[in-house]
Regions:
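Extended ligand-binding clefts on enzyme/binding-domain cores
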Residues: 15-232
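Long, hydrophobic/aromatic-enriched structural stretches that serve as scaffold segments
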Residues: 1-17
Length: 235
């Protein structure tokens, strides 16, 4: 919705849906930050993504790396920062929305960094150490019928989430998305293949998906960058 609004915001004659959609996008962003994230002071200054409004969180409540989308949070943050306050028919849930979005972005980056080696699992658990750094929490967690430690149908989405961040915010990619994706791309460039031993079972069903997803990262970044240029140049 935000991209659709941005695509036409400079048009002299805007579509009939323009105001309705941008108000809905703003309200949806506020609802997401309110109901789909956790702010628990016992885990330091982190705002953690949940797996929906009713599950997911710290420790045994579980995490899924592919749910984290820092680029989407930046998009919502910036959209809300520029949204006309007079058009809102509700009270914002936080006095400083930008700060709360930035906390969520930083926490998601920390979660993604923890899980990467450089691939990520379908599911996992996280907590914080004595210095409030995000670390792993031992134990099992899974959902959707996919194994916890497999780079499978859940985990493969993580690449696209991070690539979206790099494409939408290229000036910020050096701090997170570029080094994150570089490890994955480097493995493929070096002809990485899983050992044909005990770990093969975790790759057999997803080899095509794995190689396709990773090898297409650069192409997807180019495509999204082009889309961004088109959106910002429309008048």
């Amino acid at each position: 919705m935000i991209l659709a609004v941005q695509a036409v915001e400079n048009w002299n004659e805007k579509p009939s849906w323009y105001d309705e959609v941008r108000k809905f996008a703003d309200a949806s962003s506020s609802a997401f930050l309110t109901f789909n994230t956790l702010d628990d002071s016992s885990y330091g200054d982190h705002r953690l993504l949940k797996l929906g409004s009713c599950w997911g969180g710290w420790k045994g409540n579980g995490q899924n790396p592919s749910y984290h989308s820092p680029g989407s949070y930046k998009l919502m943050r910036d959209f809300q920062a520029s949204f006309p306050a007079g058009m809102r028919t509700y009270t914002l849930p936080f006095s400083d929305m930008t700060t709360e979005w930035n906390r969520l972005i930083a926490t998601s980056n920390g979660v993604l960094n923890h899980f990467q080696c450089p691939l990520v699992p379908n599911w996992g658990r996280v907590t914080v150490d004595g210095n409030d750094n995000i670390v792993g929490d031992s134990g099992s967690f899974s959902g959707s019928g996919t194994p916890q430690y497999e780079f499978g149908s859940e985990a493969s989405r993580t690449i696209w989430r991070v690539a979206f961040d790099a494409a939408m915010y290229p000036s910020e990619m050096d701090s997170f998305s570029k080094p994150y994706l570089s490890g994955i791309i480097s493995q493929l460039d070096n002809g990485y293949a899983p050992d044909a031993g005990v770990n093969l079972k975790f790759f057999e069903g997803d080899t095509v998906s794995l190689r396709f997803s990773c090898s297409m990262v650069l192409d997807s970044m180019d495509l999204l960058s082009l889309s961004r240029r088109v959106l910002t140049s429309r008048s």
